[in-house]
Amino acid sequence: MKLLRWCKANAMPVIAVLAAAVTAVFVPPDAAYLGYYDVKTLSCLLCVLAGVGALRRVGLFPLLAQRLVQVFHTTRGAVTALVGITLVGSMLLTNDTALLTFLPLSWFVLERTGQTKWTALTFILQNCAANLGGMLTPFGNPQNLYLFNHYNIPNGEFLSIMLPPFLLSTALILLCCLFLPREGLTVPRQETLPDKRRTAVYGVLFCVAVAMVLRGIPYWLGLLVIVMALLVLDRRALLGVDWGLLVTFAAFFTFSGNMARIEPVRELFRKLLTHGAMPVASLTSQVISNVPAAILLSRFTDDYRGLLVGVNIGGAGTLVASLASLITFREYTKHVKGQTGRFMVLFSAISFGFLGVLLVAMTLWMR
């Protein structure tokens, strides 16, 4: 029973490891396995998560968010601010970390102001903001970090590729926020202040992580500095890293590497990708999630522009299209009981609506 509960709580890494194990039956482990793993991507992801975790532990993000929300005095204004914070946060913190940080804050605000009836819509819009807002930066989404390093995409080109879908996504999110009422409310205040010295040090460590991602410093140097610093200053920040996400990445590297060596699979994806990387990436993401889709399809195409856009807009749609969406679902069911069906209907309507608009618009844009 305990094992079953643990597997349910860690569904994605468990599924990823099982998928890798199944492919290992067809491609037995050999020396080629060592070439599957992108150590730079794993190192950068670890350092970003650790840096953000340290800042989160000193209470910086909830304080900044609450101060911003206090500027607004209506349901529409407060929720729009919370969604906006999540969108901006996802560009800097990664989408899953932004959701883990700001979804609890949204529940806190909605509950204390008697507006819990808007929890589903607020959480869903925050989910869209995290998944689609994070597309603008190389470290905003895990799949971005992988593709950015795998194809060695220049910083300026990455921004030029992702800016159009980002702007359209932002406009769609803000449009949805207009459906919220302009009821007056009082937002609760938090007076607890983070330790300024520790916050400054952790801020520097986070900047080191960003410099790693943007190739400003060698990744091994950044990894050494951040890990050694946190071992001394805050070991819990390291222990609190989402190790399941790192295991998931490593397992999917194995899965995609093996799949690329199975000839019928290679032939299938070669044929599919003749129809364009973007639609194939978007649709593949709906079934196996956008992170493994990015890793798998990168083995078969050099069209990194289409693949990058495809796996990012492919984060909208089904609940499994993005790993971060499972965080939103888990947070909602933790706070709101007996309304899972209503949540899924609203989630599907909004998420598939976003996917449809973005897919059509970007197909026309990239012709």
Predicted regions span which residues?
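Transmembrane helical segments that form the transport core of multi-pass membrane transport proteins
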Residues: 36, 58, 62-67, 205-302
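C-terminal transmembrane helix pair
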Residues: 159-170, 174, 279-367
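Membrane-interfacial loop-to-helix junctions in multi-pass transporters
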Residues: 39-41, 70-83, 112-123, 197-200, ...
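Membrane-core helix-loop-helix motifs of multi-pass transport proteins
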Residues: 114-182, 188-191, 328-358
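Flexible interhelical linker loops that connect adjacent transmembrane helices
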Residues: 2, 66, 179-203, 235-239
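Structural signal for alpha-helical transmembrane segments and their membrane-water exit/capping regions
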Residues: 2-32, 42-59, 178-182, 208-236, ...
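Hydrophobic transmembrane alpha-helices that form the pore/transport pathway of multi-pass ion
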Residues: 82-132, 295-308, 337-339, 363-367
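Interfacial loop-to-helix junctions that mark the boundaries of transmembrane helices
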Residues: 3-9, 31-41, 153-165, 191-197, ...
